[in-house]
């Protein structure tokens, strides 16, 4: 089996049949291009709608698509990522999630360092197909001021 053959096989999760499928390389490239395009659109939307100069100008944010088991499918940078969805899955069952749910947290400890400090806000939205969660779209961004002793949420006098 060559490297090209490996790229031509996709193993589906047991919940979706657990079968191995042969994937046409052209179809694979179309899917890859669609995922990249989706990530680029997420980036543009994040920058365009941001109120925080850290997001808008410094580009201190992350966008990505995860599967239902918290594995990265596609993202715009690789320095962040693992740990963004796992805290949500530990707190909420997939079966209890509903269309329209948005999950939000900013705790760097529960996400195993995927975000670095409390000003990084993570938002995750489950994606549904036929009533089942199949993926998550995830963003995080650095917000300048989330409250605290001093403007900017960072005070040298805090203990």
Region roles according to the model:
Residues 2-19:
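Intrinsic disorder/low-complexity segments
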Residues 10, 20-82, 87:
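Long, charge-dense accessory insertions within large macromolecular proteins
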Residues 58, 97-98, 132:
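A generic structural signal for short, non-catalytic loop/turn and secondary-structure boundary residues
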Residues 62-65, 104, 124-126, 135-138:
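Structured core elements
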Residues 128-159:
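Mobile "lid/hinge" segments at catalytic clefts and subdomain interfaces of large enzymes
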